[in-house]
């Protein structure tokens, strides 16, 4: 016959610690994702040309046991950022959805900007007589995709470390 004895107080303490671990894993995940998105945002801002604005962070709904973070461009206040990332006209990156852009030049009305100093040809509409500069477009200067790829491994490590720290906190009693 096998006889088993246990200390009810220690068993209850163990159950409480396990509950604390479950809570801390979610908390650690959230902290890790928050830090990872902040680090990705910081790198994207370093890679982006121009002002250090227009790149936002959002932590998505955590009530579904799925924690998600995203770094994205503020297209409402900075609508040109997609063109900076993917380019325009014949230089457009196909990943940006610009498959037609390889065949279509851009037309800029002469009243919008004086581009004569750049030597762009001028097209006169046979229908309206209006004049347009014919421009090829702008080369892409990606910043979001490189930041995401460069931060991929580091983000995994940031999240892993945050979860490990929360678990260590929950099981401190065990290591003492």
Label every model-predicted segment.
Residues 89:
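Short, His- and charge-rich active-site/binding loops that engage polyanionic ligands
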Residues 1-78, 92-176:
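Short, Lys/Arg-rich flexible segments
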